[in-house]
From Swiss-Prot:
This is Elongation factor 4. It is a peripheral membrane protein. PANTHER family: TRANSLATION FACTOR GUF1 HOMOLOG, CHLOROPLASTIC (PTHR43512:SF4), TRANSLATION FACTOR GUF1-RELATED (PTHR43512). Pfam families: EFG_C, GTP_EFTU, GTP_EFTU_D2, LepA_C. One of its GO terms (molecular function) is guanosine tetraphosphate binding.
Amino acid sequence: MQQSHIRNFSIIAHIDHGKSTLSDRLIQHCGGLTDREMAEQVLDSMDLEKERGITIKAQSVTLNYEARDGETYQLNFIDTPGHVDFTYEVSRSLAACEGALLVVDAGQGVEAQTLANCYTAIEMDMEVVPVLNKIDLPQAEPDRVAEEIEDIVGIDALDAVRCSAKTGIGIEDVLEVIVNKIPPPEGDREAPLKALIIDSWFDNYQGVVSLVRIVEGQLNKKDKIQIMSNGQTHQVDKIGVFTPKPLDTGILRAGEVGFIIAGIKDIQGAPVGDTITLAREPADAMLPGFKKVKPQVYAGIFPISSDDYEDFRDALAKLSLNDASLFYEPESSAALGFGFRIGFLGMLHMEIIQERLEREYDLGLITTAPTVIYEVETTKGETLTVDSPAKLPPVNDIAEIREPMVEANILVPQEYLGNVITLCVEKRGMQTNMTYHGKQVAVTYELPMAEVVLDFFDRLKSTSRGFASLDYNFKRFQTSDMVRVDILINGERVDALAVITHRENSQGRGRELVEKLRELIPRQMFDIAIQAAIGNHVVARSTVKQLRKNVIAKCYGGDVSRKKKLLQKQKEGKKRMKQVGNVELPQDAFLAVLKVGK
């Protein structure tokens, strides 16, 4: 295919604005699959993706489209995830394209994540083409939404294509716009090979399959390739394109998007965003924008029964074959036994991994409260990174703690602005910017990541009745007065219940935890003292009252000293019990930590 007839594009859309349905229609229109094979949401291949209606991994499809001018064009569509946790995957998918369709729901209008991805695309000098979807709905207001796109995003949307992916109206117009508005790829087919890895996943039979965009040069079957970030070399066994089904072509040239299989054994060997080149004539520099993906949120995950530990470890190893951003290391806890400390990109990522472990590998798991990474400077001048409360050094050894700050961009209708500002202030946020776009307001806050990670998203949705949308990215580490709140039960620390929090909130947080635990721990034959402490200073306490038998019920009248003797005996028994008795913590107690502050 000549380069002038290739179009590489992706679709930018908020969750539920109809991206996957639109891509299904495009595939159907170009005859990529027969009607019998046409399942809903062809590109979302994980069950979980279909169920939650979100796209997690990037996928691609190559379609041949006969345009109205009689020419045949090759359209390479790269599907991108839309959720805020997967922004790096989005930026890699966008880097492989020359243009993007900005799909906006004609009923709902522009949302913050769409906006964030759209700005990423504009920064990369991509052509952004607006498309109004769902115009068949009774509540659709295409004219208002077109104005909103112009106000907020700043691109011309008066002649935006209007379509309905569900009913198939306007699909051909969308294809024509792709051909006419999006520029063809540039790139010298004679230059040394440079290919961008858009995504990699693991196939049980063929090893790692990488989705690549050839930027310069060409790649043939049996070529020896080199991965530029780690210098490993492999031989290409298979090369081709997805029409959603894999089709071997034996060659890919500059400007094209396809897959390669080169017998790579683990996904770390082909990291997303890396550059592939030929071993015999390597390119002189990597493609820009590659970065190692860093986990933002850590949580300890433990199997409920310790017999499952081996299965749990194998399950994690299998999951990490397909997910390069998953980081894990063994951890043991006095309360929960052996498990793993796992790093995630964000809360959605954490929920998805946990759900996949429970669903696909049939494991029962306990999760401890998620924490972010803190930088701790000790009095000896060393800098440590701490990802769990247990690793925090003793109070006397800490010179300062720095916590990660994020820049959060929030888009909200004017009438809910007050609620959102109140919420951000409560979460220790600092407002840095505020602009009005028609009825919407865009506010920018600097917030501590620890506050955003826990329940900020849920609370933002509830205070704004679901209208506010959020996008955030890591900004820097900032010195902050953080403390560890320990929970003591009958004077013994329970490591799995400790949390790191800001000193201002520590008393409230401690009190809430203690109250929550008091409701959950069953009563025993002796008093159970639950305390929250910072260092040696107890900030909150509560007692689970003992159950006691009425020992003097059998006495009729008679002398009072007889009753006293029985009560005294009971008291001594209780005292002895308290010294030897252990408190069994129920499963819910560990979940209580996650719910505090909601």
